[in-house]
C-alpha cells in the first residue's frame, strides 16, 4: 500500500516542483464526476493523484504508480475543523460532496480524502479523551499510535507557493488555537492535534488552581467561626470551685496577641457578648456570692456564666441531677419558683455561714439567675389557724410583698411545716429544724417556735389525720391549709398546677395524679405538700 512507503511524498514533491501552477485551475474546473471517479479509483491508496486526468489513457492508469497522500492546506483544515466542532463528527454520504466543493477552492481534494479525514479526526479525539491527564507528551503519542495516516501527512511539506485565499463566509469563527503550527510539520502546514494537545494540557492546570483557591478560601472563612465558638463556649463544663478563667475582651472576640485565627468580619449584627455588655454595662447578671477567694473582675465570660442551659420543666426527682448540682444557670419557665430562682443575698449569707446544715440547698441554688423574684426576703406573717381543715383555699389573687423571694426553704420556714408530723410538733419545740438559721438572721416572721405552737394548736382542731398543704405561685405563697388525709383535687388550682411532697431541706417529690387531677393515693398523715401554680 502507498501508506507503507514513507519516501513517496518526498518523491512527489521533487517531481512536481517544476510544474507550473496553471495545471491546477484546469483540474479544479473539471466536472466533479470525473474528479470523484478518479478519487474513488485511488481510494485504496488513501489519496488523489494529479496524474489521473481526463486526458490520460487507460493504459497509463493501469500502470502501478505510487499515489502520494493528500496534504491538506491550512485553509482546508480550518473548514474541516469548523465542521467537526459543529457536531458533524461522521458526515453522511450526501454531505461529503458538499464539503469537498468547499475545500476545492483552496486545492485538489477528493471524497475519499474528506471521509478519511473525519475518521482520523474522530480517532484522535477518542485517544485524547482516554489519556486526558497524562500530559502533552502522552497525548501526542496516543494520537500518533491511533492514526498512522495522520502521522504520515504531518511529515509531508506543502508546495512553496500558496495562492491568496478568496473571501468566503466561514461556517464558524476560527479560533486562534487552531492556527498554531505543528512541531513536526513544515512552517506552512498546521494541525489541529497540536492545538488540541496544548489546550488540553492547559485546561486541567487551570482547574487545579481554581480548586486549590476554593479550598483555601473555604478554610479562611471557617477559621473565624471556630475561633468564636472556642471563645464563647469555653465556660461550659468548668466546676464552680475552680478559679474563673481570664475574661476576654468585650469588643474583640480574638485578642491581638493571638494571631492564630483571622479577625471576625465587621457587621451591623452584635454578638451575645457585645449585646450583654451594652445593656448591662459589663456587670454580672446574678448577684455575687461571698466566697473565700477574691471575686474576679467582671467581663464577658463571667457575665454570661450559665446563660445557655435552658430546661423547660424540673425533672421528676426534683433534685440531684447533674445540671442541677452544677448550678450553671438552670432556668425553668414557670413551675420551679420553689426551687430557688429567687435566692436572696441574705439567704446566701445564711447558707455560707452554716455549710454543714444547708449544703444541699447551697449546691442546688448556686449560679441560678435572678429573674425579678426579689433581692431581700421580708417578714411574711402567716396565720396558720385561719384556714379551716378540709376546705380548699382560693387561688391567691394578691401577690406577696413585691420583694419577697419564693423558695422551698422560705415556704417551709415561713409556714413552720418542716416538722409537721404529730410526733414532732410541740409547743415551742423546733430544735431539729434545719432552717433555724433563717430565723436567726430575721428572715422569717417572728421565731419558728411561735409558728410551731400555732401549728400544734391548729392540728387538734382539724382532727388527728390531717396533712398540711401550701399553695405557691409566682406572686408568692398563700397561708398553709390543713387538709384531711384523703384524696386531693389538684385541678382546683388550675390545669398546670402540680402537687409536690416536701421531704425536708430542699428535697421534694412529685405526687402522682390521675387524668381528672385527683391524687391516686390519699394524702399522708402529718406530711407537708406544696401546690405549685
Swiss-Prot record:
Residues 28-41, 175-202 have a biased composition (Low complexity). Residues 1-74, 125-212 are annotated as: Disordered. It is found in: Nucleus. One of its GO terms (molecular function) is DNA binding. Residues 65-129 bind DNA. It comes from the Eukaryota. Keywords: Developmental protein, DNA-binding, Homeobox, Nucleus, Transcription, Transcription regulation. Pfam families: Homeodomain. GO terms for cellular component: nucleus. One of its GO terms (biological process) is regulation of developmental process. Residues 161-174 have a biased composition (Pro residues). InterPro entries: HD, Homeodomain-like_sf, WOX8/9-like. Residues 132-143 have a biased composition (Gly residues). Gene3D superfamilies: Homeodomain-like. Residues 59-68 have a biased composition (Basic and acidic residues). Its main location: nucleus. Belongs to the WUS homeobox family. Transcription factor which may be involved in developmental processes. This is WUSCHEL-related homeobox 7. It comes from Oryza sativa subsp. japonica. The gene is WOX7.
